[in-house]
Amino acid sequence: MERYESLFTQLKERKEGAFIPFVTLGDPGIEQSLKIIDTLIEAGADALELGIPFSDPLADGPTIQNATLRAFAAGVTPAQCFEVLALIRQKHPTIPIGLLMYANLVFNKGIDEFYAECEKVGVDSVLVADVPVEESAPFRQAALRHNVAPIFICPPNADDDLLRQIASYGRGYTYLLSRAGVTGAENRAALPLNHLVAKLKEYNAAPPLQGFGISAPDQVKAAIDAGAAGAISGSAIVKIIEQHINEPEKMLAALKAFVQPMKAATRS
């Protein structure tokens, strides 16, 4: 959890926002997945948001569902994902690592065991996409017991009660949804969410990061101009992996070329 705090403090001092890429662990295979993650960090990623392949990804658009299918095709298991997480943490001791996942994967292991494992491999945060705030107690309590930040999604239509709950229960950062619906770069992010950002600040919520449909530097800049602490981009990155699936070196070069201007857009 502390890694997020020190990241946001450092970024504030440098007058920068955070750029955070999302990828599915093990896509398109364990070895290339590790190279992808190294490349994202070298290109300027401030933190990582990682998915664990799951058979029924409700909130994901087709791009990220395909990433999951590729990881499954490569035989990637949740146990292997935790081995990969330990390797990433070893190699990159200071970068915040977040997991974005579904409740079934947590239940399969047992809630407490799952968060204990996260703590052991050095995961900083977990967002359980299909657990609403009002049902989150067992997850967030286990997370805090194991020094893992529970992350909550703040939808564009959040009312005051929900904003207060998110501010009270969330740690690390707040996942600010650009709009309702499934993920995807083709559904460009809507207008900046100034009013939500202002409310979250008022209630002392963890710093908001805007996600969903972030695929261009101008959107990163707009998110930060609206008061967000940074932006998360998933589908646009996973699409690059898909486009260069048979050319691993080209894939890494294209990822670097995408991330560098996205990170540059966080500098005011």
Curated annotation (Swiss-Prot):
One of the Pfam families matching this protein, by short name: Trp_syntA
Catalytic activity field: (1S,2R)-1-C-(indol-3-yl)glycerol 3-phosphate + L-serine = D-glyceraldehyde 3-phosphate + L-tryptophan + H2O
Self-association and partners: Tetramer of two alpha and two beta chains.
GO molecular function terms noted in the UniProt entry: tryptophan synthase activity
Gene Ontology CC entries for this record: cytosol
Keyword Lyase (UniProt): yes
Coiled coil: none
PANTHER family: TRYPTOPHAN SYNTHASE ALPHA CHAIN, CHLOROPLASTIC, TRYPTOPHAN SYNTHASE, ALPHA CHAIN
Active site: E49 (proton acceptor), D60 (proton acceptor)
Protein family (similarity comment): Belongs to the TrpA family.
Pathway in which this enzyme or protein is active: Amino-acid biosynthesis; L-tryptophan biosynthesis; L-tryptophan from chorismate: step 5/5
EC number: 4.2.1.20
The entry's keywords: Amino-acid biosynthesis, Aromatic amino acid biosynthesis, Lyase, Tryptophan biosynthesis
Protein name per its UniProtKB record: Tryptophan synthase alpha chain
